[in-house]
């Protein structure tokens, strides 16, 4: 698209550049990695949400994060997941994701009113239906919470914000989800967790929908663990044996033994089927936690359960890029190609269906060509500026190219000596060629 097709405006002090396809911009949310505005899509007359990714190419970490979110949004297509409808790159090289606009989120809804039983059931069913699909694709959401669950006026629910989503891998690192909804294995083991962390988060959300307030509102991770044990009791030996950190192990074993509180006592007004499902979702040992597929078949959700309409992903998500450490320019080329592939236009510089090492090799070469072209443009501009300077210099002060050449080749002390350095464009190409070899060999 040409620059004339973009409209620039300021929102919350942030430049927002969108194509003239979208009108009626209004801010609806601000996060650590982007600003979200509502808008009207003039092609469909439907409301949409437009998320601006802040400075996606400022660092390789941010570039990789944006690439991951884009790949996930392209791959995950399900009724209970937010759907990518458009994506574009602005003249300022910011990336914009366009998705469906939902009227509110579960966090806001819970602040305004208590939920009746049928709404709790229907919302939980849709959350688990979405998780079944996500987990079948080999993806963990990792940050499931009420504010990441969007709802429209028809009570249709969609899970959003896959920026933290990761590969289904038993060797994980670090704290990820918001504390209230964080599974105990993340706090205890740091490295060993899987799709079950999403089931724990969904269980916390289930309880919050029932009570209208968070179940485990920890002030910090120590307090968080403490109030979990107030309900579930001390962690079993099988869980303690998985703790990797010596300090964490000392802390857990130093705590006095606690017996679990029966859920029927804690949730006295809750029907037995709801209590049973909640108990199966909030289990200390992730290996014994119910799966999304089994939870959908639980009697509590029988009013909505339909095994013929609870699809799984057609293919596993390709996480081959996840351990790659690439320069920003390479991520940029790969992202551009993903955008072109989404729109099915143009000639992507790399084949997005190729193996990841082939994509890296192609992207590195493309980045080198772009760098070389930029270098040539800069060199051309410098030559033009030099010619303009010479043209404006008095004749007696001008130095001819022949004089420069004779000066460079002369050994006479009366003539200045000129040192001609390496060609920057050649250096750039050499560096990128070395990088290409390095990255290709890394993935062989």
Swiss-Prot record:
Annotated region (Disordered), positions in chain: 371-444
Residues modified to Phosphotyrosine: 175
Description of how activity is regulated: Activated by tyrosine and threonine phosphorylation.
Enzyme kind, highest EC tier: transferase
Motif TXY mapped to chain: 173-175
Record's compositionally biased regions (Polar residues): 394-405, 427-438
Keyword Transcription annotated: yes
Gene3D superfamilies recorded: Phosphorylase Kinase, domain 1 (3.30.200.20), Transferase(Phosphotransferase) domain 1 (1.10.510.10)
Enzyme Commission no: 2.7.11.24
Keyword tags: Activator, ATP-binding, Cytoplasm, Kinase, Nucleotide-binding, Nucleus, Phosphoprotein, Serine/threonine-protein kinase, Transcription, Transcription regulation, Transferase
Cofactor(s) required for function per UniProt: Mg(2+)
Record family assignment: Belongs to the protein kinase superfamily. Ser/Thr protein kinase family. MAP kinase subfamily. HOG1 sub-subfamily.
The name this protein goes by in its record: Mitogen-activated protein kinase HOG1
Species classification: Eukaryota, Fungi, Dikarya, Ascomycota, Saccharomycotina
